[in-house]
Amino acid sequence: MNMKLPVNDVKFVNDKVSKYWNENQNELKAYFHNKLMGVKGEYQAALNNPYDTSVFKKHYSNGDVINNTGKFRSFLRLPLGYNALVLPLNKTNVGFELFSEAAYKLKVARKIGNKLTKDHIFGVTEVGVHIFVEFMNSGWDWKYMCDEWLPNNLELFFTCRILKSEHQKEDDNDTNGVARGEHTLEQKMLLEHYKEIGIPLPLIVVN
């Protein structure tokens, strides 16, 4: 693990995530493999659907899930965005959580209440689409995806505890709220979508 996200204790995060992978890699790879094969099977079945030859164009983005909307594109957030890891990267499994500065201050003051939410830093739809395209472009090479891609991209599944007011607009005049679908994964790795709404960096690691 080579952490690229701006956090205040990179070594700690690298060590914890490496330990998580080393201790659970067979279970993680087995489950990820099943998720990959599921979306591959559905996509390929849509190519030659016996009931409606237009279903691929209408609901599977005509093969271009990066640029075209569609039910399958949206669906990818479930098996690959939310649920690709059988053991989520939460405090129970990796021994830490990420907080924005404002969220951390509430935690220290013990005033969290219902003011915080967990934000999927990279966006579950974006991550789901990215994984599917990587898998497809690899020639459906599940071994590469499980043995090489997954351990080198675990940070795509990180969440961060932020204020609800940082997470989404409270009304039409609110200038806060993390932008959705406006940044590349590379920009999100630098947390540009957080910086734009005034969330200070680095994120705070709490064990």
Question: Residue locations for each model-derived region?
Answer:
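Hydrophobic/aromatic-lined pockets within catalytic cores
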Residues: 126, 164-171, 195, 199
